[in-house]
């Protein structure tokens, strides 16, 4: 069936209510002309997906209640723990809860028969497995994953960018590289081409970090030393009742090189024994890290006989920068005689390059168009798609409007919102590549008796994300509303300004590793449950979806978007505040919690089997 539709007064809104009253918070009307082939239901779903909701909450929203994301939804989100038998009045309808509904979870607003669609964010997120009562909580026992089908781009997407006049002349002080990229940090990289060199990497780390003032505080080492002291003093009975370790009050050791932010040592389990594709991809990923603007140069250790050959690495570096000019030190153990000789030479040459790096690299002003921001969520909860994700989506829109790049990844967590992203593509071939990569990924998962439907973790489900489509609909909010300008396969490098889609897993560290390998010089990472994830090369800003998490895990959370849920600020206001945080981090004025903890996570994505 073909529909020629002009939608006037397209309404996207949020509604809040408590047991006594109803609060209509925002009603945005705008004209939108569309032309597409679809059923009535898919038209509604596509339109709802094209326009993300915005929040402009008043003091009334601080009252505990429920939330509706779009008017077509047949579920409500609990903002607090609701009890069986409670009576709610919402949008002129009365509800009596048939079950307890924990905060962040959803309940049905209408009775659902087996096979009926469940709609949230205006898109299909699942189907009823059995009869679901009005007011009954949705769980894996009554709802299973179902996502809408998708097809090639059939409509032009019109985007109104946010007003970015206040940032048009804003700069950050970064490290300018010869290829035109600008780094937010200035690191020397030490990396193995194969897992056989991991021990040698660890030896180099021990040799360099402490002496150069880059070692993380050793508070747990101090705790063990205290226990040894008590034991040797005959006071071992005091150990059982010893309190938690205190933060290290001693000042950090002074850095030898003022203009070097650190030496980063990578470890991995790849480079040989798997498919040639995995070895080639590892070389491409490492090439992306060496090419990265936060890296001034690198020391590479190779065994010599592995699949991941030095020649492949050099070829991948040239693909990213034909005029590559950074210092690159390569050592092959099988061609170096003794280990002692190779390691001593590696230390000497690396130290010389660090001296040069310290003399030649200085921060200088750069426009915000030089930012490349990774957009990631992990340890997600039922508030992720309501607070933190749309807030960094607004950051993405601002950066895109300023000519910068953003990267939205985690393809298993874009399941169910594909059509919206396809229709936002700037060119037909961009959308077609996304379709092909999504279908190939889904087929690979099915080939090993898995699927995107198995993506939600036990923690996701406990906190309200019952199906992958439900999780995906909220995860996609990180991409804002700007056009999709490029689609990258792993481990390709990002060059196109605007929103880039990148094929990666949802796995936190594999995804961030890939985003940084694609050029992200800052990563925004939202979490509702809490995760310590960081990266060796790019600062990772951890953003909580709720204030309880920010208070409970203050040692790993950098920014709290809980005030959105509390009705204190809008998504746009929060996004602007996050952007200011990004600028401070990019300037080097602020270290992220992951940086302070030395959370240098690096896991290459291994697509193939071990052989």
Segments from the language model and where they lie:
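Metallocofactor- and cofactor-centric catalytic cores in central/energy metabolism, strongly enriched
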Residues: 56-376, 380-484, 496-513, 519-522, ...
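Secretory-pathway ectodomains
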Residues: 28-31, 122
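Extreme N-terminal basic, low-complexity initiation segments
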Residues: 2-8
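Short acidic/histidine-rich active-site segments
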Residues: 526-531
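Short, Lys/Arg-enriched N-terminal segments with co-localized hydrophobic residues
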Residues: 45-55
């Amino acid at each position: 069936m073909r529909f020629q539709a002009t939608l006037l007064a397209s309404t996207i809104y949020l509604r809040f209510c408590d047991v006594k009253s109803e609060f209509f918070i925002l009603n945005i009307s705008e004209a939108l002309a569309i032309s597409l082939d679809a059923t009535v239901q898919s038209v509604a779903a596509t339109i709802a997906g094209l326009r993300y909701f915005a929040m402009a909450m008043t003091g009334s929203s601080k009252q505990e209640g429920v939330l509706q994301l779009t008017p077509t939804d047949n579920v409500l989100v609990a903002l607090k723990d609701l009890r069986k038998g409670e009576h709610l009045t919402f949008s002129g309808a009365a509800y009596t809860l048939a079950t307890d509904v924990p905060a962040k979870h959803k309940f049905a607003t209408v009775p659902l028969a087996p096979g009926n669609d469940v709609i949230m964010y205006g898109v299909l997120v699942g189907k009823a497995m059995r009869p679901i009562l009005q007011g009954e909580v949705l769980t894996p026992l009554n709802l299973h994953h179902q996502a809408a089908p998708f097809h090639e781009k059939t409509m032009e997407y019109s985007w109104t960018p946010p007003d970015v006049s206040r940032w048009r002349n804003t700069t950050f002080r970064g490290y300018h590289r010869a290829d035109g990229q600008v780094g937010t940090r200035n690191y020397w990289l030490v990396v193995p081409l194969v897992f056989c060199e991991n021990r040698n990497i660890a030896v180099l780390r021990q040799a360099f970090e402490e002496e150069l003032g880059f070692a993380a505080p050793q508070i747990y080492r101090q705790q063990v030393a205290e226990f040894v002291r008590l034991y040797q003093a005959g006071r071992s009975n005091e150990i059982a009742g010893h309190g938690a370790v205190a933060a290290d009050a001693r000042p950090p050791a002074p850095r030898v090189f003022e203009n070097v932010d650190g030496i980063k040592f990578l470890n991995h389990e790849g480079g040989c024994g798997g498919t040639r594709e995995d070895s080639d991809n590892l070389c491409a990923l490492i090439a992306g890290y060496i090419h990265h603007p936060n890296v001034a140069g690198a020391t590479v250790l190779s065994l010599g006989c592995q699949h991941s050959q030095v020649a492949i690495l050099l070829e991948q570096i040239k693909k990213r920068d034909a005029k590559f000019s950074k210092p690159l030190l390569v050592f092959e153990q099988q061609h170096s005689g003794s280990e002692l000789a190779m390691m001593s030479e590696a230390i000497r040459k690396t130290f010389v390059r660090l001296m040069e790096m310290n003399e030649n690299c200085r921060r200088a002003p750069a426009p915000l168009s030089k930012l490349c921001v990774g957009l990631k969520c992990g340890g997600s909860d039922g508030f992720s798609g309501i607070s933190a994700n749309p807030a960094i989506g607004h950051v993405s829109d601002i950066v895109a409007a300023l000519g910068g790049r953003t990267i939205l990844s985690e393809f298993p967590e874009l399941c169910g919102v594909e059509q919206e992203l396809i229709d936002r593509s700037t060119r037909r071939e961009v959308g077609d590549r996304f379709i092909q990569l999504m279908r190939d990924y889904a087929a690979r998962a099915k080939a090993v008796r898995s699927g995107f439907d198995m993506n939600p973790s036990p923690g996701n489900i406990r906190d309200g994300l019952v199906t992958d489509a439900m999780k995906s609909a909220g995860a996609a909010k990180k991409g804002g509303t700007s056009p999709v300008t490029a689609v990258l396969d792993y481990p390709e490098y990002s060059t196109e300004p605007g929103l880039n889609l990148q094929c990666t897993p949802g796995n936190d560290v594999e995804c961030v590793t890939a985003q940084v390998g694609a050029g992200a010089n800052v990563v925004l990472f939202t979490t509702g449950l809490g995760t310590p994830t960081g990266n060796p090369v790019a600062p990772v800003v951890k953003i909580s979806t709720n204030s309880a998490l920010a208070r409970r895990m203050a040692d790993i959370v950098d920014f709290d978007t809980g005030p959105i849920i509390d009705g204190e600020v809008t998504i746009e206001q929060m996004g602007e505040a996050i952007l200011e945080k990004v600028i401070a981090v990019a300037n080097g004025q602020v270290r992220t919690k992951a940086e302070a903890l030395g959370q240098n996570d690096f896991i290459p994505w291994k697509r193939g089997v071990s052989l």
